[in-house]
């Protein structure tokens, strides 16, 4: 569930739009995790939109996805969000102003994610228009390409 102002959007698991990805460490890269959540179309201030958030890989010292329960990560500035290439899509991809994401639980191949922050609602406005958002979602855990098929996604 995504809440922006009084508008609510539900997760969209179709077309592999939503997932919690865990990448195991290898000889060249440390372990990391990432989050993509697409939301079903809905009304937002008279427009039908299909918002999404992309949080790119976050390095971790954890060796299994289950160990990530309780993990948090924060971005405090637009510049940091731009550097990481994290974004929120409403009308167009925009960096986030700030956010905090937490892994609340991992159960039955799903991750319970909570993310709160401030997004850029309209990047064309001068100055841009900001708005708070809240996400509380269960999304599929993907550790390998085969997981998509196992989860029938």
Task: Put a short name on every predicted segment.
Residues 1-9, 98, 118-153:
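Edge beta-strand at a domain terminus
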Residues 1-91:
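An ectodomain-focused feature that recognizes extracytoplasmic/extracellular
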Residues 12, 63, 109-111, 143, ...:
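Residues in flexible loops and secondary-structure boundaries
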Residues 25, 31-34, 107-111, 125, ...:
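A sequence-composition feature that detects small, non-aromatic residues
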Residues 72-135:
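Acidic, glycine-rich flexible loop segments
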